[in-house]
Amino acid sequence: GLVFAEQLLGLSEEVKHLEDEIDMLEIERERLKVWGRFDPEEINRLKEAGILIKLFRCHKRELSKIPRKFSTNIISEDGSTLYLAIVSKEKDFSIPLEEMEIPIAGMDEIESMIKKKGVHLQHKQNEISNLYDKSSVIKQALMESRDMLGYEEAKAGMGREEEIAYL
């Protein structure tokens, strides 16, 4: 019975951890939506080949801050906010706009991770369900443990002197 309870606690912690991971991945997926589907590894390969790509977010009226020597690609827009990829053959460059971090993983990889973790979460939730079906065993073990504890407490409180026993 206690083994079931320990399993249940362990599974509950795993479920909570998986739910948190899925939540974080879903937030990352939402953050990446504006950039569309691309492989961040491709950006790294281009960098190794001497082509630097940086991602920026800016207001439409800030486009004039970008020097003409750079190739500017508008990836998407959300109202007056633009999401840009700026391409250069310079080793490094700085533009007075809000630079966005290149993601570690692309949308496809994030969605695949969400799916895998979702399947794993469902499996753990099924295990919890199966343990709940065995809850009568856990309750029985709990009652037996309480009875045993009561007996041990009574036994520990007993004393004896010669032929007289007392509590």
Language-model-derived ranges and their functions:
Residues 1-167:
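Long, charged N-terminal accessory/stalk domains
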